[in-house]
A protein has these predicted regions:
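Helix-loop-helix hairpin linking two adjacent transmembrane segments in secondary transporters
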Residues: 115, 152-198
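Flexible cytoplasmic inter-helical loops of multi-pass small-molecule transporters
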Residues: 197-221
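Paired small-residue
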Residues: 99-106, 114-122, 317-325
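Helix-breaking motifs and short loop linkers at transmembrane-helix boundaries and internal kinks
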Residues: 56, 88, 109-115, 126, ...
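Cytoplasmic helix-loop-helix junction between adjacent transmembrane helices
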Residues: 119-160
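Conserved MFS/SLC helix-loop-helix module at the cytosolic interface between two early adjacent transmembrane helices
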Residues: 75-114
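Helix-to-loop junctions at the C-terminal end of transmembrane segments
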Residues: 77-88, 279-292
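A late C-terminal transmembrane helix in Major Facilitator Superfamily
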Residues: 342-380, 385-386
C-alpha cells in the first residue's frame, strides 16, 4: 500500500508543468527511446542475406534471429515495468540501454549463428526498456489530455524510424559490411545513454516496500482486473495488428498484384506513414478540445469504414486511397488508447505499461505471422485481415467500454 506522503509526492510530480524547449527535448528523448525496436529490426532487414552468407547458414536460421528479437522484446517489457515502479525509472533504463549496447557490439564479434541469435535476444531484452519506461514517464509527468498530446507527438517522431531505417541500413551496406549496422546501433545506444544520464530527470520516486515475486504478481493482478485497461489495451492491440498485417502483406499486393516497381512501392509506403503522422499531429491539438475517448471512438469507427472498402476495391488508386485513410486513423487510435489505458494506473505506471506493450506486441506479432504464413496476396485478402482487426478493435471498445467506465 502507498502512504499519503508517497501519493502526495507523485501528485506533485504529475502536476509539474513542463513547457517550451524542455518539453520538446523530453518528447525527443522519449521518442528516441521508443524507436529502438524499428531501428534494430528495419536497419537489419537489408542485411539478412549478408548475415546468412557470413555465417554460412540457411535462411531459416537468419529468420530465427528476427524471431528471437521479437520474443525478447515482448517478454522483456514484463521485467522492466515492475523494476521501474520499485527502483525509479532511470536505473532500469540505464541498465537496459547498457545491455542493448553490449549486445549490439557483440553481434559484430561472434563467429557462429547460434551466438548471433543469442545476442539478438539480449539486444532486444535491453532495447525494450526504453519503450516500456517511456510510456511510464509520460504517465508520471502529464495529466490525461496533455499525455495524449505528448504520446501523439512521440509517435510522430518515432514513426520516422521505420520510414528511414531500411534506407539507412541499405546505405551502410553499400559503403561497408553488415557489421556496420550493429556498430551504428551501438553508437546510437551511446548517444541515448548520455541523453538519459545527463538530461532526463527521475520522474518516479523508488518505493521502500520489498521487491519480490509476490509484490510483482500482486501488481499484475491489479492491472488484469481493471476492465477498462484491458479494453483499451485490446482495442489498441488489434488496431496495431491491422497495421502489422498491412506491413507484412502490402508488398505482395502492391508489387505482385498491382505491378508497382519496388521504388514506387517505397514511396506509397512512405505516403501511408505520412497520413498516420498528420493525424497524430492533429490529434495532439484536438485532445485539448475533445475527450481522448471521443477521438479514440471516432478513429476506430473511421478505420472500420475505410478498411471495409478495401475488400471491394480492385483498382490501385481506390485501394490505396482507402488504405491511406485506414492507416491514418491510427493517429487518433494509438495515442489515445495508450493514454486512457495508462491513466488507470498512476501509482504503478511501469507495470501497466509493461502489460500494455507486451499485449500489443504479442497480438501484432501473431497477426503478422498469420499473414506471412498463410498469405494475403490480393487486395480482397489483405482488406479482409485489416477489416477483421479493425472490427475487433472497435467491437471491444463500443460493446464494453460504457459498461466498464
Amino acid at each position: 500500500m502507498y502512504n499519503k506522503r508517497k501519493i502526495k509526492r507523485q501528485t506533485m510530480q504529475t502536476s509539474t508543468k513542463i513547457t517550451g524547449f524542455k518539453k520538446l527535448w523530453l518528447i525527443f528523448i522519449l521518442a528516441f527511446m521508443s524507436a529502438v525496436a524499428p531501428l534494430s529490426t528495419d536497419m537489419y532487414l537489408p542485411a539478412l542475406s549478408r548475415v546468412q552468407e557470413a555465417f554460412a547458414t540457411s535462411e531459416f536460421f537468419t529468420q530465427h534471429s528476427l524471431a528471437s528479437f521479437f520474443i525478447a522484446f515482448a517478454l522483456g517489457q514484463l521485467i522492466y515495468g515492475p523494476l521501474s515502479d520499485f527502483f525509479g525509472r532511470k536505473k532500469p533504463l540505464i541498465i537496459g540501454i547498457a545491455l542493448f549496447m553490449s549486445a549490439s557490439l557483440g553481434c559484430v564479434m561472434v563467429d557462429n549463428v547460434a551466438h548471433f541469435i543469442a545476442l539478438r535476444f539480449l539486444e532486444a531484452l535491453g532495447g525494450c526498456a526504453g519503450v516500456v519506461i517511456a510510456r511510464a514517464i509520460v504517465n508520471d509527468l502529464f495529466e490525461l489530455r496533455e499525455a495524449a498530446a505528448v504520446f501523439a507527438l512521440m509517435m510522430v517522431v518515432s514513426s520516422l524510424a521505420p520510414m528511414l531505417s531500411p534506407t539507412f541500413g541499405g546505405f551502410l551496406l553499400q559503403l561497408f559490411s553488415w557489421e556496420s549496422i550493429f556498430i551504428s546501433l551501438f553508437l546510437l545506444g551511446i548517444a541515448l545513454l548520455l541523453f538519459v544520464i545527463f538530461t532526463l530527470k527521475e520522474s518516479h520516486e523508488p518505493h521502500k516496500e520489498s521487491f519480490d515475486f509476490k509484490a510483482i504478481t500482486s501488481r499484475y493482478k491489479d492491472v488484469l482486473k481493471d476492465r477498462p485497461f484491458i479494453i483499451y489495451t485490446l482495442s489498441s492491440g488489434f488496431a496495431l495488428g491491422a497495421m502489422f498485417a498491412y506491413i507484412t502483406g502490402s508488398s505482395f499486393v502492391f508489387i505482385k498484384y498491382f505491378g508497382l516497381h519496388e521504388q514506387v512501392y517505397a514511396l506509397v509506403f512512405g505516403a501511408n506513414s505520412l497520413g498516420f503522422m498528420i493525424l497524430s499531429i492533429i490529434n495532439a491539438r484536438l485532445v485539448f478540445w475533445c475527450q481522448p475517448r471521443t477521438l479514440l471512438g471516432l478513429g476506430l469507427a473511421l478505420m472500420c469504414a475505410f478498411s471495409l472498402l478495401l475488400m471491394f476495391f480492385d483498382s490501385f488508386w481506390l485501394f490505396e486511397g482507402a488504405l491511406f485513410c485506414a492507416i491514418a486513423c491510427l493517429g487518433f487510435i494509438a495515442p489515445n488508447a495508450v493514454t486512457l489505458a495508462m491513466s488507470r494506473f498512476k501509482e504503478h505506471s511501469g507495470t501497466a505499461s509493461a502489460m500494455l506493450g507486451t499485449t500489443q506486441f504479442t497480438l501484432a506479432g501473431i497477426i503478422s505471422f498469420g499473414v506471412g504464413a498463410y498469405g494475403a496476396n490480393t487486395p480482397w485478402q489483405l482488406g479482409l485481415v485489416i477489416f477483421a482487426c479493425s472490427a475487433l478493435a472497435a467491437g471491444f471498445f463500443f460493446a464494453f467500454i460504457k459498461k466498464s467506465a
